Curated annotation (Swiss-Prot):
Chain sites annotated for binding UMP: G61, D81, T142, G143, N144, P145, F146, F147, T148, T149
Gene: pyrH
Pathway noted in the entry: Pyrimidine metabolism; CTP biosynthesis via de novo pathway; UDP from UMP (UMPK route): step 1/1
NCBIfam families associated with the record: pyrH_bact
Molecular function GO labels: ATP binding; UMP kinase activity
Function: Catalyzes the reversible phosphorylation of UMP to UDP.
SUPFAM superfamilies in alphabetical order: Carbamate kinase-like
Keywords: ATP-binding, Cytoplasm, Kinase, Nucleotide-binding, Pyrimidine biosynthesis, Transferase
Example GO biological process: 'de novo' CTP biosynthetic process
Compartments, record wording: Cytoplasm
Organism encoding this protein: Wolbachia pipientis wMel
Binding site for ATP: K19, I20, S21, G22, G62, R66, T169, Q170, Y175, D178
Pfam families, alphabetized: AA_kinase
Protein's UniProt name: Uridylate kinase
Family stated for the protein in its record: Belongs to the UMP kinase family.
Length: 247
């Protein structure tokens, strides 16, 4: 696809990692998958790929199974987390199919080997896929219990040398309180990593934020519903950026 010089000059990032929650795949449903919502999400990712940006994705599994919730109900935590990892593989395969319907080559790489349905995670192989213009979808989190997919996203972003972590949520940025419950909640345009930790703003868990901070990878929090993903790549639209850089 031809990319104009103006479009190239607008692109702020050359390699990005999207963190997509399982809930984002539910759409308006309470459980499972909303194929229309997944289709729209996939089209947004395709638009980013068409700009020549290298894209990798970490997908959650909360629309199918939540390990922490199950452990509170009596299921062993480690077992619950492994079940949650399997849920992320299901989501990754569905997302892969939608991307390939839009003629974007993609590969699912799982931290838990499952050779008949996806590739095992190998860092150098993942980077090679990105260099060839394929979308890489990381499944099964880190492959270890007790670590969230947020931590997996930060880890993979570091390993892939990504320019930014893009966290798509239900709201258009980071707020001082839940805007759905508190109409006085204030949205922040910019925060530092320390702000997230000290104010307990619940954007990502502490280990994910620490990994991003140690490796100077900014985190952008934006709405998957109200904002075109391609605008974020160009530095446009409404979002919160988490970084220690002042510019």
């Amino acid at each position: 696809m031809f990319i104009s010089t103006n479009e190239k000059s607008e692109i702020k990032y050359s390699r990005v990692l999207f963190k997509i929650s399982g809930e984002a795949l539910m759409g308006s449903k309470q459980f499972g998958h909303d194929m229309e919502a997944i289709g729209e999400l996939s089209k947004g990712i395709v638009e980013v790929c068409n700009l020549g940006v290298q894209v990798c994705i970490v997908v959650g599994g909360g629309n199918i199974f939540r390990g922490t919730s199950a452990s509170l109900s009596g299921c062993e935590r480690a077992s619950s987390d492994y079940i949650g990892m399997l849920a992320t593989i299901i989501n990754a395969l569905i997302l892969q199919n939608f991307l390939e319907k839009n003629l974007v080559a993609s590969r699912v790489l799982s931290a838990i080997p499952m050779a008949t349905v996806c590739e095992p995670y190998i860092r150098r192989k993942a980077i090679r896929h990105l260099e060839k213009g394929r979308v890489v979808i990381f499944a099964a989190g880190t492959g270890n219990p007790f670590f969230t997919t947020d931590t997996a996203a930060a880890l993979r972003a570091v390993e892939m040398n990504c320019d930014v972590i893009l966290k798509g949520t239900q709201v258009n940025g980071v707020y001082s309180a839940d805007p759905k419950k508190n109409e006085d909640a204030v949205m922040y345009d910019r925060l530092s990593y320390t702000d997230l930790l000290t104010r307990d703003l619940k954007v990502m868990d502490a280990s994910a934020i620490s990994l991003a901070r140690e490796n100077s990878i900014p985190i952008i929090v934006f709405s998957l519903k109200g904002e075109k993903i391609v605008n974020i790549i160009k530095g446009q639209g409404t979002y919160t950026i988490v970084s220690d850089c002042k510019q």
